[in-house]
């Protein structure tokens, strides 16, 4: 009986210890959660992220509503919101924009480029597979551009196209009847041929967008207009060639960008990746 009583006493003590340990763990978690939520994380937890990474991948569109399932796309609306948020976040010391895009809507690319220029934190563009057309336009908004030797860079040009169903309609016996108010209202209608006057009208706008692109590259990259004009034939070039003509600053990858932040800006980078 004495042994049984001792055993019961030991079990009671063990149970009480277990309960107290559980209560202690609960309050420890509550205290940690309280301080994580309500204190300056940079002081309490030195591992707090201090460098934002924004990915600009695929086709560049203007709004989130334009994003389609199954397609790799980035909306300028979202990226600009991220950059505005970063500007007001004292924890973030620098921004890396990872680019793998061959362009998209001109206004969308310009919006992101201008938002980068407005950003008060140091900015670095890292071109992965491709930074061409609108993708390159975004890159020039950054303080510094890195790319791989194998990256496809440039394509400082503008393209516009339209469909022409006139021969197909003729073969199928379809007759096109036009009812239009306004001389150029149906310009680009695929059911009739484009007139020479309409072609000139469209080329006027294409050339104007091209000129703006050239001027932005020259201004933001510190290049002569004449230099950019020679490069602005719509072609792309590899990383080493792009560096030689001033389209990028350095050959490197994410580790090289992080080292640049350490060496030049005295930032020990802890990355936070924004996901769209």
Spans of features found by a protein language model:
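N-terminal organellar transit peptides
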Residues: 1-125, 130-134, 144-147, 160-276
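Active-site loop architecture of trypsin-fold serine endopeptidases
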Residues: 150-158
């Amino acid at each position: 009986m004495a042994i049984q009583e001792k055993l019961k006493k030991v079990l009671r003590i063990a149970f009480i210890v277990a309960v107290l340990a559980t209560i202690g763990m609960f309050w420890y978690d509550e205290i940690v959660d309280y301080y994580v939520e309500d204190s300056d994380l940079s002081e309490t937890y030195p591992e707090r992220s201090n460098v934002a990474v924004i990915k600009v991948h695929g086709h560049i569109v203007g709004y989130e509503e334009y994003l389609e399932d199954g397609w790799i796309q980035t909306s300028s609306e979202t990226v600009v919101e991220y950059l505005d948020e970063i500007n007001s976040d004292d924890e973030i010391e620098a921004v890396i924009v990872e680019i793998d895009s061959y362009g998209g809507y001109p206004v969308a690319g310009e919006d992101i480029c201008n938002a980068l220029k407005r950003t008060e934190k140091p900015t670095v563009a890292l071109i992965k597979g491709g930074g061409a057309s609108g993708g390159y336009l975004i890159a020039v908004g950054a303080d510094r551009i890195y790319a791989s030797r194998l990256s496809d860079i440039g394509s400082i040009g503008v393209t516009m196209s339209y469909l022409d169903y006139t021969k197909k309609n003729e073969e199928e016996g379809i007759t096109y009847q036009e009812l239009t108010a306004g001389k150029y209202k149906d310009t680009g209608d695929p059911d009739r041929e484009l007139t020479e006057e309409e072609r000139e009208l469209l080329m006027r706008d294409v050339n104007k967008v091209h000129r703006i692109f050239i001027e932005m590259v020259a201004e933001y990259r510190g290049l002569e207009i004449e230099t950019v004009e020679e490069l602005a034939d719509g072609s792309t070039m590899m990383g080493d060639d792009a560096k030689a003509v001033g389209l990028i600053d350095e050959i490197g990858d994410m580790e090289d960008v992080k080292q640049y932040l350490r060496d030049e800006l005295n930032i020990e980078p802890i990355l936070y990746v924004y996901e769209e």
